[in-house]
């Protein structure tokens, strides 16, 4: 299950944003109780791919790389 601040990669190219499969990003918003996610993806230089912030991704489009740390 994906959650806020998880590190993910994109499974397939996203022609709308220019992000390629394997591009790494961070989940910055969880929508509809986990039905969709806003992800901040980064290019090779570490810059935000801004168009990704206006795109909703489903869990089927994302692969979790690292689970967000939780503070107790």
Region roles according to the model:
Residues 3-63, 70-71:
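Basic/aromatic-rich interaction segments and small domains that mediate binding to polyanionic partners
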